[in-house]
Amino acid sequence: MEDTGSGKNGKDDIQTKLDKKLGPEYISKRVGFGSSRVAYIEGWKAINLANQIFGYDGWSTEVKNVTIDFLDERQGRFSIGCTAIVRVSLADGTFREDIGYGTVENERRKASAFERAKKSAVTDALKRSLRGFGNALGNCLYDKDFLAKIDKVKFDPPDFDEGNLFRPADELSEMSRSNMVGDAHTEGPSLKKRSLTNEDRNAVPSAPAQQTYRSNNHTTQKRAPKAQAVTASASPNEETSNQQQDPDDLLDDSFMFSDEIQDDDLLNMNTTTNNKNSTNSSTTTTTISDEATGIISPVTFVTAKAATSLQHKDPIPSGSMFDPKFQAQSIRHTVDQSVSTPVRATILKEKGLDSDRSSIYSKFAPKGKELSGTTTNSEPYVAAPQTSATESNRSTPTRSNAQLAGPQPAPQLQGPQRTQLGRPRMLQQPNRRNVS
């Protein structure tokens, strides 16, 4: 019966929120047909309102259908009209379903036109479906009297709150907190301070203190309680104070203090840390001393077959050792291979080698091809430029037998010679008749 009542109270609370009308902070306006202004609620604001009223897990959406009504292309630009049907369902099974429409005009890219049209249609259908639940989700925007009065309500835009931003540091802090909680559960109950009574302070330990062990990350540390010095003779004032104790002093008030580590724990932790630091410092000192004395680990070159035996620290046969300075006697070594230096002409003369390389270069064509034996060394061969068959046909005409016989002297033509300045005279030819 209590669950039913709580569920009923939850529904009444949701219904009360849905009956309220929207404030001016949630209402936006745009220019409609002509000079009129249309009031509407943006999609992201409608989603935030639904999360506040129903809860982030109290409602869901479902796209039932998406239809392309038209697609026009003119001069490389696209215009699309799209229809979408969306259903909004609540956790108890209640749902609202409505239709939305989206259009895009004169879009250059086809894919972008489809994307904008479909998103606009789905968002419109979502807002119209949420409107069916009540005034708080946009149904009040269809009341003209309400719109006429809401314009007179003044409001201050919300200030930007930098502390309300979701930052990566917040996520890291949450992860660290969860890790700390997990470590606390694995370690067991934490040590807490408690006030010691006078009897505890003056009590003489009858047995040696027992060693307690505490595991943290698979490491065991020994903790010994602090020894308390007790005087042999107690003053009468202390005895009377022990007899006159307040009952509140006997109460264990360990829950009223923080979970800080006790002083003896801090001493033990510092001792362990100092031991580790001393060990690390000794290792570092040994390494530095070896480097200072010049001790270098031996380096050995071996063959591939002897590498496995070297890894297993087995004895290596003498034949498997690799000598990087070995020089074969069958090869004539004229240049020191261990040094990268240019070869001088004096060294070639000492070795009896010819330093002139022009005779060597003349034996090869420009592209590195060796020339035939008919060419001499003094006259290097120069390859003539090659022409294709089509170029030869265009540039070189065919010759007759008379032309191939040999060159013939050109006939000498006697023409008029100019001896005076001015216009040359026309000579009368014998074959031409004078026509009167």
UniProtKB/Swiss-Prot annotation:
Gene Ontology cellular component annotations, sorted alphabetically: nucleus
Keyword Transmembrane helix among UniProt keywords: no
Region described as Disordered: 180-252, 367-436
Keyword Transferase: no
Pfam families: Rad52_Rad22
Locations listed in the record: Nucleus
Location, primary (coarse class): nucleus
Sorted UniProt keywords: DNA damage, DNA recombination, DNA repair, DNA-binding, Nucleus
Low complexity composition bias: residue spans: 402-417
GO molecular function terms listed in the Swiss-Prot or TrEMBL record: DNA binding
Gene Ontology biological process terms, A to Z: DNA recombinase assembly; double-strand break repair via single-strand annealing; mitotic recombination
DNA-binding region boundaries: 127-131
Bias (Polar residues): 208-219, 230-242, 372-401
Subunit structure comment from the entry: Part of a complex that includes RAD51, RAD52 and RAD59.
Family: Belongs to the RAD52 family.
Role: Involved in DNA double-strand break (DSB) repair and recombination. Promotes the annealing of complementary single-stranded DNA and by stimulation of the RAD51 recombinase.
Entry protein name: DNA repair and recombination protein RAD52
Gene designation per UniProt: RAD52
